[in-house]
Amino acid sequence: MRTFSGKRSTLALAIAGITAMSGWIVVPQAQASGFFDDSTLTGGIYYWQRERDRKDVTDGDKYKTNLSHATWNANLDFQSGYAADMFGLDIAAFTAIEMAENGDSGHPNEIAFSKKNKGYDEDYSGDKSGISLYKAAAKFKYGPVWARAGYIQPTGQTLLAPHWSFMPGTYQGAEAGASFDYGDAGALSFSYMWTNEYKAPWHTEMDKFYQADKKTNVDYLHSIGAKYDFKNDLVLEAAFGQSEGYVDQYFAKASYKFDLGGNPFTTSYQFYGARDKVDDRSVNDIYDGTAWLQALTFGYKVAEVVDLRLEGTWVKADGQQGYFLQRMTPTYASSNGRLDIWWDNRSDFNANGEKAVFFGAMYDLKNWNLPGWAVGASYVYAWDAKPATWQSNPDAYYDKNRTIEESSYSLDAVYTLQEGRAKGTMFKLHFTEYDNHSNIPSWGGGYGNIFQDERDVKFIVIAPFTIF
């Protein structure tokens, strides 16, 4: 087991600050009571064990350890009420404890902390235990208007989003928005966010933003977005975002729900677009023209026990990168963006030209006298994945006229405790078999986001609790 490291001093100062506030804030009791009386302190204990093997086509197609580790997380999340019904404070921290890790396991494993504290310093050399302050924000509300500033996670309608392990990543910045309810005519909500630093949940220190060369500064990211709920089961959303002087991103989504055979049927169309401002064939020139990912989703719930999903995506990402990214800075874990498609089948299925179809089902076993139990399965098939349309230094496997296929299936078993002190604790076992239908090595041949065949097993425990 590795020793603790990280931001003990930062966390201690933050907690001390909250404690001290009760002594030195002088406001009328009627105004201060909301801050304390409406506050909450929640948390959780989390366990993650993973065994993932990946085929090495350069060494006789042997499967080799890619991830093999067992890690604990725990968090505390304090959310105040509002003093004078206007001002509040949120603060949260979590710890990661590396219990075991195979020496051949890849880094970072994204559940513990990387040995490198900052995203742009990442050298994939190892993981460690530690503590991270992931939320420390002042908050404000007045009528339909709200705002937050500090260490925050986006909550509004913008394109900005954090990475997730058990805990979310953190932006340094500010977000503000408003919501207006027009009765039967619908409800409008919109927000704006600005940020100048970010850390993924497996990094302990904030880092600035850069272009793909990791040298050219990007001073800030910002985004604005809106949602209109027509209150007739039709919802429209749109957003625009920018990394300063570098990448513009676009988002639109239409969702609709209706009854089919007495059961709810949901559908959506989603569009994600990105365009960079560099056109000089340098490393910062990631797309040629506008790249996009389109998605069509269908969901159907049968007899309140079976959830069915049918979803499809289509990608266009001409240029040097060769795949679509929802974030506005291309470097790994440097920022993140909204993407409402999640299949948990290993690949992102986002190569240039790639089309993918997903089918999934979850079955609640409560009618079999097994309350809390659920089982599921899913399958993805993808085709027409093209490599980058150009590369400065292509490898021997690069052929711009090639296309490849990918496929994957997953099995799930979930149990959630239904009563007792540990009510709500969830145990989940997830297995994935992924197949890259080619003999190209991982990340090779101009496929910068496609790896070789994998077998992946995850065991997860989530135990939430409330202190007050």
UniProtKB/Swiss-Prot annotation:
Species, as recorded: Salmonella typhimurium (strain LT2 / SGSC1412 / ATCC 700720)
PANTHER family per record: CHITOPORIN (PTHR34596:SF2)
Keyword line: Cell outer membrane, Ion transport, Membrane, Polysaccharide transport, Porin, Signal, Sugar transport, Transmembrane, Transmembrane beta strand, Transport
Secretion signal, residue range per the UniProt entry: 1-32
Localization in the cell: Cell outer membrane
Gene Ontology terms describing biological process: monoatomic ion transport; oligosaccharide transport; polysaccharide transport
Gene Ontology molecular function, alphabetical: porin activity
Domain of life assignment: Bacteria
Lineage: Bacteria, Pseudomonadati, Pseudomonadota, Gammaproteobacteria, Enterobacterales
Family named by the database record: Belongs to the outer membrane porin (Opr) (TC 1.B.25) family.
Underlying gene: chiP
Principal subcellular localisation of the protein: membrane
GO cellular component term, pick one: cell outer membrane
Record carries keyword NAD: no
Function: Involved in the uptake of chitosugars.
Pfam family, one: OprD
Signals that turn on the gene: In the absence of chitobiose, expression of chiPQ is silenced by the ChiX small regulatory RNA (sRNA), which sequesters the ribosome binding site of the chiPQ mRNA by an antisense mechanism. In the presence of chitosugars, the chbBCARFG chitobiose operon is induced and acts as an RNA trap to degrade the constitutively expressed ChiX, leading to the translation of chiPQ. Chitobiose and chitotriose also induce chiP mRNA synthesis.
Protein name in the entry: Chitoporin
Membrane topology per record: Multi-pass membrane protein
